[in-house]
A protein has these predicted regions:
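Hydrophobic alpha-helical segments of small multi-pass membrane proteins
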Residues: 53, 57-61, 83-88, 115-118, ...
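Hot-dog-fold acyl-thioester-processing enzymes
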Residues: 38-64
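Non-catalytic linker/capping segments at the edges of enzyme domains
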Residues: 1-36, 40-42
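A generic structural signal for short beta-strands and their flanking turns/coil linkers
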Residues: 19-21, 31-33, 78-84, 95, ...
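HotDog/MaoC-like acyl-thioester-processing domains
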Residues: 2, 90-94, 98-100, 104-135
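Hydrophobic beta-strand-centered segment that forms part of the acyl-chain substrate-binding groove
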Residues: 50, 66-98, 103
Length: 135
């Protein structure tokens, strides 16, 4: 059976939602994950501003990937987000986005993660906290 890191490295590129949004996993390991989402006109709300739901989805996916970024071989591969709080601090205007997810506390079943979403210029767009629950 593969480790959680190996599982998530295969999951993200094969996820229909990630494929649709263009979300790519660029780094994963040691309780950390980095994901990118390219700007697409389909993701805007007003003008060229990326919709908050797309940003939240990127943050949620980064938290999940960070939670899975360890060397545990799971008995039952599965889990879900138990909670997600997103604070939007700046608009994402016509920009590719990068999310960095970092585990801040890992328990037996629950994993708390902090996520920072930035635009292509490095400006922080959103900060998020997520709790991931393993099956």
């Amino acid at each position: 059976m593969p480790t959680r890191t190996a599982i998530i490295a295969q999951f993200v590129p094969n996820s229909p939602l990630c494929q649709h949004l263009g979300i790519a996993l660029t780094e994963v390991g040691n309780d950390r994950a980095v994901l990118t989402m390219p700007f697409k006109p389909e993701l805007v709300t007003l003008g060229q501003t990326v919709h908050g739901g797309a940003i939240a989805t990127l943050a949620d996916t980064a938290a999940m990937a960070a939670a899975w970024a360890d060397d545990v071989v799971p008995e039952k591969p599965g889990g879900s987000t138990a909670s997600l709080t997103v604070d939007y601090v700046a608009p994402a205007n016509a920009s590719d986005l990068t999310a960095v997810g970092q585990v801040i506390r890992r328990g037996k079943r629950l994993c708390a993660c902090e996520i920072t979403v930035s635009d292509a210029g490095g400006q922080v767009i959103a900060k998020a906290l997520a709790t991931y629950s393993f099956a």
